[in-house]
Curated annotation (Swiss-Prot):
PANTHER family the record matches: 12S RRNA N4-METHYLCYTIDINE METHYLTRANSFERASE, S-ADENOSYL-METHYLTRANSFERASE MRAW
Family: Belongs to the methyltransferase superfamily. RsmH family.
Entry's EC annotation: 2.1.1.199
InterPro entries: RsmH, SAM-dep_MeTrfase_MraW_recog, SAM-dependent_MTases_sf
First-tier enzyme category under EC: transferase
Record-listed S-adenosyl-L-methionine binding positions: G36, G37, H38, D56, F84, D99, Q106
Coiled-coil positions: none
Function: Specifically methylates the N4 position of cytidine in position 1402 (C1402) of 16S rRNA.
Keyword entries, A-Z: Cytoplasm, Methyltransferase, rRNA processing, S-adenosyl-L-methionine, Transferase
A single Gene Ontology CC term: cytoplasm
Protein name: Ribosomal RNA small subunit methyltransferase H
Length: 302
């Protein structure tokens, strides 16, 4: 087994698990198992009759499986949350925790292709069994598709130029590695900010490869169905697109627009937020730089 903290240093560990308000005999779900840090903390707070189900689509995470009779690890994408809980006979749960984004392990494993720091084949699949990889996005997407994803997922003003340059280059030779992609795009980026903007470009490609926005929406809609009244939702986001969806869904049960009012002017929403936005302390950011962009939102099912 890998040392959990080496695989992924859990962010906002105490705060996110506190948000679940764990009942000793409750049923909980950690939808982003990773290195198992959050799951271990939940298990510490569960009694002998409590249950914890965890999801992770990355086979590497299976090496961190916790040997505990109260724990079940499901090697699937959390977009299938309800389906696989029902397979285990679970229809309602007391709390759901999610720590979205890429694990430290995935960033640090060069061959996974998530990081701008290493030269590797363009991949970025969280589930290595999926067909779509960064290679297909970069080499097969139309120019308009590339432009849209750079705009939508990275908010890049020079998205048209980036897309045009990629399409022009691949006519001669396929773009197969991160080093090729970096060398191609760096001259188009603001001097002194090349690495930051490259990271945004990689984020956009990764979101597309793993359908992260669609997956998050599907997951959030299911939480309303599976949480018991009073059950808790504790979710950590790392970029504004994710956080905006989580915030809107908690507030209104919708991803856009406003909920309809009844004839008396009342609105019906599935959740009530618990406290406000929680961000990491300066101390945590110093110890774990990846925590710097984390945002935790907690809600209670009505």
């Amino acid at each position: 087994m890998m040392i959990l903290m080496e695989y992924h240093n859990p962010v906002l560990l105490k705060e996110s698990v506190d948000g679940l308000d764990v009942k000793p005999d409750g049923i909980y779900v950690d939808v982003t198992f990773g290195g198992g840090g959050h799951s271990k903390e939940i298990l510490k707070r569960l009694g002998p009759d409590g249950k914890l189900y965890a999801f992770d689509q990355d086979k590497d995470a299976l090496e961190n499986k916790i040997e505990d009779g109260r724990f079940t690890l499901i090697n699937e994408n959390f977009r299938y949350l309800k389906r696989f809980l029902r397979f285990y006979g679970i229809k309602k749960v007391d709390g759901v925790l999610g720590d979205f984004g890429v694990s430290s392990h995935q960033f640090n494993e060069a061959e996974r292709g998530f990081s701008t720091r290493f030269d590797a084949k363009l991949d970025m699949r969280m589930n290595q069994g999926d067909k779509l990889s960064a290679y297909e996005v970069i080499n097969e997407y139309e120019e308009e598709q590339l432009k849209k994803l750079f705009w939508a997922y990275a908010d890049l003003k020079n998205a048209p130029k980036l897309a045009r340059t990629i399409v022009s280059e691949r006519k001669n030779n396929p773009i197969e590695t991160s080093e090729q992609l970096n060398d191609l795009l760096k001259p188009l980026l603001f001097k002194g900010k090349e690495n930051k903007i490259l990271a945004q470009i990689y984020q956009a490609i990764r979101i597309e490869v793993n359908q992260e926005i669609e997956v998050l929406k599907e997951f959030l809609l299911q939480t309303e169905e599976i949480l018991k009244p009073g059950g808790r939702l504790s979710l950590i986001s790392y970029h504004s697109l994710e956080d905006r969806l989580v915030k809107r869904y908690i507030r209104s049960g919708l991803f856009e627009g406003e909920p309809e009012k009844d004839m008396y002017g009342n609105i019906s929403v599935p959740f009530k937020k618990v406290n406000g936005l929680i961000i990491p302390s300066k101390e945590e950011i110093q110890q774990n730089n990846r925590a710097r962009s984390a945002k935790l939102r907690v809600a209670r099912k009505l």
